[in-house]
Every structure is written in structure tokens, then in C-alpha cells.
């Protein structure tokens, strides 16, 4: 990538980046370059141990992005127009080459841009980074559906069932954030394929839902544990998040799931134990707010397919 900071993308990324970049000029190309650099920085962060401390101070990827953005002159209107033109080209190429691995890699790279642009879950204030942010949020909202619906308390999860699920997570809660991704035991696996859950998801989102046979426990066990903004893997249409345990902070509101919209707005969704959210997460850039002092949380993440 000429005329951009010296970053070395893996070959699989370079193939599609260079082909798409060749179709862009002027501000559209500059914006695409900024997103690719942001994606490279985002994918380099420690995904398995995300805590606010890992991206603070000198490790904040926005420092490098701001140096690049300082070279980007033009009015807000000009950059908004460039964003719209760039989006049309990128969406056309990603859709046309949907089954090709280099373009799947490009989609991952651009999704990772949201991490570097808002590593603290706060929408950028710098004008250039804000345009880039809105662009990447709009990209995934146009590629896929991006609805999010609270399912409320799941009526079939009584206190006994909730206690069984919490017992399954005991080892993971002891290990902490590193244990995130742990496969559930029998109770969690049963919930992940429960027909009642599929019906609730389908009714909430207006689709026919079937089990994805993929579920993971997520643990937030330290102050500052969180998950930065990202869209999910496109393999699954829906991600259901079931709260199993939430020790709230002594003061202030608890951590919420954040849903970002292309206009720069942010929606907050809090979960109580036993309640769930249905998220069309491959089209929705979303994040988990950092745990506040004394706050702890355990979530079961369930992948669901749309049929």
C-alpha cells in the first residue's frame, strides 16, 4: 500500500486490499487506507485478555491513527461524500467475491478497524476518525441485518437451572478472563439448542431460528475487563447472550452491551441474571462496557442460524 504508513499485511489480506484500493481514488482511497491501518492495529491487540489496561496510554492504537488522519484535509461534507462512494465500491466487491478467501479476509480486516478506532468503547471525537468509524459501522449494517432485541427473563430458567449453569462456570470464573471461550457442560449445551429459545429468538427477530451448535462462556472477572467494538463472524446470523451472573458495582450503573449505529449513536442494553439478548451481531458493531470497580459478570454466548 503506497502512500500509507509502513504496515505489513499478511499476503491473504494484501491480495484483496490491493485490488479494492486500485478501484478507489482521492479521499475514498485515503479513507480506505485509514480503515486498513486501523484493521491491522485492531487485529494485533490481545483478543484473549481484553482489559482497558491493554489499550491505555502508549498502547492506545488511536495515537498512530491520529497521525495518519492529520494528513487528511477536507470538509466534513467532502469526507461524508467520500465515505458513501467508498462504501458502494467495497460492498460491491465484498458481495461479488463473497466466497473467495481473500475477500473474507478483507471483511475481517475492516471489522477489526472498529477495535482500533474505539478501543475504549467511546465513539471517536476527532473528525477524521469519526468519519472512519461511521463508515465501518455502516459497512456491516449494509452487509447484514443488525437488529438487537431483549428477550427478557427466560421463563424456563428457574433458580435451580440458573444455579446449575453457574456451577458449570465455577472453574472458568476462577481462571478469569483467559477462560473466556470455554465450552459449556451439559446444562449450557442443553440451553443452546432449546426449542423454546429458538422460538423466542425467531419471534423477536422475525426469522426462523435453528441451533448453531456453538456456545461459549464469557468471563469478566477483573475491574476493566470488557470487549471492544466488533462485528461477529458472519457464519452465524444471530448471537444470543444469556446473563448467568452479574455482581453489580457498589456505585453507578452496571456494565451494558453497547450497540453502535451508523449515525454515531450508541444504544445500551443491561442484562440481569437469567435474561437474554438476541443480536444480529454480524451486521452490528457492538461491545461490552468495561467492568466497574467490584463488578463481575458471566455470560453464555450462543450462536444461532437463520433458516
Regions found by a protein language model. Give the residues of each.
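Non-heme Fe(II)/2-oxoglutarate
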Residues: 6-62, 73-84, 91-207
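Short proline/glycine-enriched turn/loop segments at secondary-structure junctions
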Residues: 287-293
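A short coil-to-beta-strand element that immediately follows conserved catalytic motifs
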Residues: 206-216
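A structural signal for short, well-ordered beta-strand segments and their strand-loop junctions
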Residues: 153-156, 211-212, 278-279, 301
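Catalytic core of non-heme Fe(II) oxygenases with the double-stranded beta-helix
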Residues: 220-284, 295-299, 306
Amino acid at each position: 500500500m503506497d502512500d500509507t504508513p509502513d504496515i505489513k499485511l499478511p499476503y491473504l489480506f494484501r491480495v484483496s486490499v490491493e485490488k479494492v484500493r486500485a478501484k478507489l481514488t482521492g479521499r475514498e482511497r485515503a479513507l480506505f487506507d485509514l480503515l486498513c491501518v486501523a484493521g491491522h492495529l485492531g487485529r494485533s491487540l490481545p483478543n484473549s485478555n481484553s482489559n482497558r489496561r491493554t489499550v491505555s496510554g502508549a498502547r492506545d492504537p488511536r495515537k498512530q491513527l491520529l497521525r495518519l488522519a492529520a494528513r487528511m484535509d477536507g470538509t466534513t461534507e467532502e469526507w461524508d461524500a467520500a465515505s458513501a462512494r467508498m462504501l458502494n465500491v467495497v460492498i460491491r466487491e465484498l458481495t461479488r467475491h463473497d466466497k473467495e478467501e481473500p475477500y473474507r479476509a478483507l471483511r475481517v480486516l475492516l471489522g477489526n478497524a472498529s477495535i482500533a478506532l474505539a478501543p475504549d468503547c467511546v465513539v471517536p471525537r476527532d473528525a477524521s476518525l469519526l468519519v472512519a468509524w461511521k463508515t465501518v459501522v455502516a459497512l456491516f449494517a449494509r452487509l447484514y441485518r443488525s437488529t438487537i432485541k431483549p428477550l427478557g427473563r427466560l421463563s424456563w430458567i428457574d433458580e435451580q437451572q440458573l444455579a446449575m449453569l453457574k456451577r458449570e462456570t465455577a472453574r472458568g470464573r476462577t481462571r478469569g478472563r483467559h477462560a473466556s471461550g470455554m465450552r459449556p457442560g451439559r446444562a449450557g449445551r442443553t440451553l443452546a439448542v432449546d426449542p423454546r429459545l429458538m422460538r423466542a429468538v425467531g419471534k423477536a427477530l422475525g426469522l426462523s431460528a435453528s441451533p448453531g451448535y456453538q456456545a461459549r462462556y464469557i468471563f469478566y472477572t477483573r475491574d476493566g475487563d470488557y470487549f471492544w467494538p466488533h462485528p461477529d463472524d458472519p457464519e452465524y446470523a444471530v448471537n444470543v447472550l444469556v446473563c448467568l451472573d452479574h455482581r453489580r458495582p457498589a456505585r453507578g450503573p452496571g456494565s451494558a452491551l453497547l450497540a453502535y449505529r451508523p449515525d454515531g449513536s450508541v444504544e445500551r442494553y443491561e442484562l440481569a441474571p437469567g435474561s437474554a439478548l438476541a443480536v444480529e451481531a454480524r451486521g452490528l458493531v457492538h461491545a461490552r462496557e468495561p467492568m466497574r470497580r467490584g463488578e463481575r459478570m458471566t455470560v453464555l454466548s450462543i450462536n444461532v442460524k437463520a433458516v
